[in-house]
Each structure stands twice: as structure tokens, then as C-alpha cells.
Amino acid sequence: MKSEDVKLGIERAPHRSLLRALGLNTESFQKPFIGIVNSFTEVVPGHIHLRRISEAVKEGINAAGGVGFEFNTIAVCDGIAMNHAGMKYSLPSREIIANTVEIMAMAHAFDGLVFIPNCDKVVPGMLMAACRLNIPSIFVSGGPMLAGRLRKNDQVSCVDLNSVFEAVGQVAKGQMTEEELLELEKVACPGCGSCAGMFTANTMNCLTEALGMALPGNGTIPAVDSRRTQLAKDTGRQILKLIKDNTCPKDIITPDAIYNAFSLDVALGGSTNSVLHVMAVAHEAGADFSLEEINRVSDTTPNLCKLRPSGPYHIENLDQAGGIGSVLKELKPWLKNDARTVSGKTIGQMADAAPKADNKVIRFASNPYSPKGGLAILFGNLAPSGSVVKRSAVAPEMMVHRGPARIFDSEELATKAIMGGKIIPGDVLVIRYEGPKGGPGMREMLTPTSLLAGMGLDKEVALITDGRFSGATRGAAMGHVSPEAAARGPIAALQDGDMINIDIHNYKLSVELSDEEIQKRLANVPAFKPKITSGYLKYYTENVTSASTGAVFKD
């Protein structure tokens, strides 16, 4: 066992003395040492309850004959960080999370790790750490929040955080009063858990099942459900089996597992952020996977779910309909069914054991919402290295669009223009210098897209950015445009009035300019000056790579 580095031999007497100070005894030194990577914090609703999950994990570890050691890492709430300087730190926190786990695991010689994430950057940050360390590891998330209930005119509707973001646009347009907004604000987030729709956090928690790194139910069992506690206990027991068999993350997260994750992703209509994160996980796992391959997956995999923000259902409905296992059951003809999982079963065996889909929340594969999946990677002279769109959340009339560019060099300027009624039907908003380097930190443009949707413009206006979008975004929103403006990508050459062509059906994103004109304009673009020149974001700006490669650090 790796933990023998700190507990065996006379030269380790000082180490054992320190361990005894923690309450361990001689018998404890014969057992595997397991790190429990918690991301509990009182700041994030999705993480406020993770101490309870951790205690259940410890029960499972103890029952199976291990010794658990809990330690923490950071977690950012993207909703609270949204639309101010804090959002510059959200994506960069992913690398910090991976690094802190690496430091703790290597410094203390754990034999295995149980990861307890929940929200957006925590899941991929921990997956990256698991692959980097490559010691037996397993995940159990905190679970999704229940949808809120809003009573209006004797009718009760289900609402969530995205309802509040979009309501701000309705207030700005005079379609909702501030008093009505306050009532919505009070009920939209009723308790602990990751925000209730198929937003980024829940996308990543569901994909963790498809990657093979979590037990069935991880993606959908609600945070407040007693089954979540039982799942945590089972996870604690299972890590001992993984240690015994020396099953490590790189045995599980293979190119086939990445393929399965994207197959599930496009079937669910998951967040565009999943592309960024799964590519980063693949990088750490040494599992090569290209953006073009995502299109091939999406071209042949049906879209089976319309979950918020793309449709009316929440994660609790997905759970009631059979959960991720039932989606995988419908997807079995498209999966790499021999891919391994931490359960000891293959992904195909997990699918076989799941209940049949309900053909409502989870459509039968023979009756999909669309024969093509929910994500698309667009290429063209505006995005030579690619851009990402959630096509399952795009109105049919916006799948092909031609319109004049309206250029904004920051999210704040674009938001001001939208709130001021300066954007008209047909426009293509371009928000640039918001990429990994340019932001820095590749902020999410949820406020602009929510305002457009709340004002009813999401079926008439497109938005293009080298930044990111929230998983709660809907509409014709193309993000991750690469190369970014700060790297002198073509998006930096755009001027107001340039005609932009969007063809999601054919994966095209282009501007009606010749290559010569683009290069001529780029030659006159001033050299990019980093916006932040001190602290962690200075280091991040200097070391982060393109969104097309997952915005990982330089090797």
C-alpha cells in the first residue's frame, strides 16, 4: 500500500506518532488510508450539506475496513460570482482544485481517494486530479437541488435559478414588476443542492456516471433524498474494493469512456461547458479526443431529453424517470459498452440493469426529440479552432442566421446595450476579449443571454463570444470561439456591421470577409495587454491555453 510510506518501519515512528495524535492506533496502521476530498463550504448552496455526505462516506469506509481522512478544497458558486469580477476566478478555480488535491494526496500518501464535489468547476477539477494522481478513486456528488414552486393566480409552476436570471430581463422590458421578481427570488432556490436544471454542475455529475467514475444514481438523486446518503455509504465501501483490485482512474477514463460521456452529454442536451471540462479531463488521462470527434458523436446520437433550460423538466424528474441508467439503456447501441466503471461492471451492464425509460422525460431512442445530439462544434473563418453551441436550446428559426455584428469588448458593455434597448432583431452580438487569457478566466455570459431570453429576443438575436456560457443559457449562443481575441484570433478583426453567417446544421460560423481582409485588420489590432497584472490571474493569463484544448495549463 502507498500509505506504507508513512506508517511502516522504525524510521516512520515520528509519522506514526503524529497519526496517533489524530486518534489512530496500532490496528489502524494495518488498514488502507483513504483521503476524503470534500468541497464543503457555507458559501455555495450546492455544497452546504456536504459534511453529511462525508460522514456517510466515512461510515462506508470504516465498515469495509479502511481509515478515512477528510480534507477540503475550494468551491466557487458561479451564480453568486456571475456578472462581476468574481466570475474571472471561476474557471481558474478548476486548476487550483486539481492542484490542491494533488498536493494533499502526495504529501500524505493515501492509498485511495473518495471525491465529494457538486458544482460547476469542482467536478472537473477533481476528475483532473484523479487522473493526474492515478490512484484508486471514486466520486459521490452532493446531488441536485429540487425545483422551486411559485404560486401565481392559484397556479403553481416549477422554477429555478435561471427563472430569476431571465426575469430580470422581463422586468427591464416592463413585463414583470419588481414585486413579482422578489416573490420569484424567494422561492426559486428552495434548499441545498446543485441548481435544479441540466446546467453545468448537473451535467458534469451525470457525465461522471458515464465516465465510469461514480456509482449509479450519482447524477440525479436529489440532495435531500435519503438515497443520496446511502449512495455515499456505498461509495465509501466501494473504494476498498478498488484499492484491493488496484483499479485506477486511467484504467477507467479511456477514449471509450470519453466517447460515452459525450454520447450521454448530447443525448441529455448538457451544458456547453462540458466540452471544456471533459477535454481537460481527457488531457489529464492521456485519452486523446478531438473537437471534430464530438461532432461525429453528436451527428449519430439522438437527443432524448429536454431538461431546463431546453425544456420543462428538472433533474428530479429525470431521476424519477429512471436516471442516467435509463438514458444509457436507450443509448446502448451508440455506446462503447465494454468500458469499465468503478462499480466493477461495464457501462453496458449498468445500462442493462437500469429500468426502461418513460418516453416522456427520457424519450425512447426510436422517438427522439432529434436524431442528432444536443451539442455542436462550429468551425469557419471566424472560429478556425472551433466554437461550441447547445443546439438543443436553439430555436428552430435561429439554426441558420445571417445578421450584422454588434461588437462589444466586455460583458459589461454588452449588458448595458441590451438593458438600454440598443439591440434589435437580427443583430449578432459579439462579446470578445472574454476568453481564457482575455477575460482573464473566460467568464460566463449568462446575464446577456438571460436578458435576451427574458426580453423575447432569443429567437431573433444571436450571441457569439470567446467567453463561455452558463449551462442555464438558452438561445443561439456560440461560445469558446477559438483562437480568442487576446490571441489575435479572427474575432478580434470584427467591426460593427460585418455580416455574420451561422449555420448550425452544417457546423459553420463565418464572417463575410476575405482571408486577406481579416489578416489586414488583425495587423492593425493593438497588442493585447493583460487586464490583471498581479496575483493568481496574472499567472493564469500567462499559462492558460486555448478553449479548444480545454483551457488547461501549458505542459
Curated annotation (Swiss-Prot):
Keyword terms of this UniProt record: 2Fe-2S, Amino-acid biosynthesis, Branched-chain amino acid biosynthesis, Iron, Iron-sulfur, Lyase, Magnesium, Metal-binding
A cellular component annotation (GO) from this entry: cytosol
Gene Ontology MF terms: 2 iron, 2 sulfur cluster binding; dihydroxy-acid dehydratase activity; magnesium ion binding
Cofactor note as given: Binds 1 [2Fe-2S] cluster per subunit. This cluster acts as a Lewis acid cofactor.
Chemical reaction(s) catalysed: (2R)-2,3-dihydroxy-3-methylbutanoate = 3-methyl-2-oxobutanoate + H2O; (2R,3R)-2,3-dihydroxy-3-methylpentanoate = (S)-3-methyl-2-oxopentanoate + H2O
UniProt cross-references to SUPFAM superfamilies, sorted A to Z: IlvD/EDD N-terminal domain-like (SSF143975), LeuD/IlvD-like (SSF52016)
Pathway membership, UniProt: Amino-acid biosynthesis; L-isoleucine biosynthesis; L-isoleucine from 2-oxobutanoate: step 3/4; Amino-acid biosynthesis; L-valine biosynthesis; L-valine from pyruvate: step 3/4
N6-carboxylysine PTM positions: 121
Names of the cofactor(s): [2Fe-2S] cluster; Mg(2+)
Lineage top rank: taxon: Bacteria
This enzyme's EC code(s): 4.2.1.9
Amino acids binding Mg(2+): 78, 120-121, 444
Gene Ontology biological-process entries: isoleucine biosynthetic process; L-valine biosynthetic process
Residues that bind [2Fe-2S] cluster: 119, 195
Assembly, per entry: Homodimer.
UniProt family annotation: Belongs to the IlvD/Edd family.
NCBIfam families, sorted: ilvD, PRK00911.1
Function, in words: Functions in the biosynthesis of branched-chain amino acids. Catalyzes the dehydration of (2R,3R)-2,3-dihydroxy-3-methylpentanoate (2,3-dihydroxy-3-methylvalerate) into 2-oxo-3-methylpentanoate (2-oxo-3-methylvalerate) and of (2R)-2,3-dihydroxy-3-methylbutanoate (2,3-dihydroxyisovalerate) into 2-oxo-3-methylbutanoate (2-oxoisovalerate), the penultimate precursor to L-isoleucine and L-valine, respectively.
Protein name: Dihydroxy-acid dehydratase
Organism: Dehalococcoides mccartyi (strain ATCC BAA-2266 / KCTC 15142 / 195) (Dehalococcoides ethenogenes (strain 195))
Gene name as annotated: ilvD
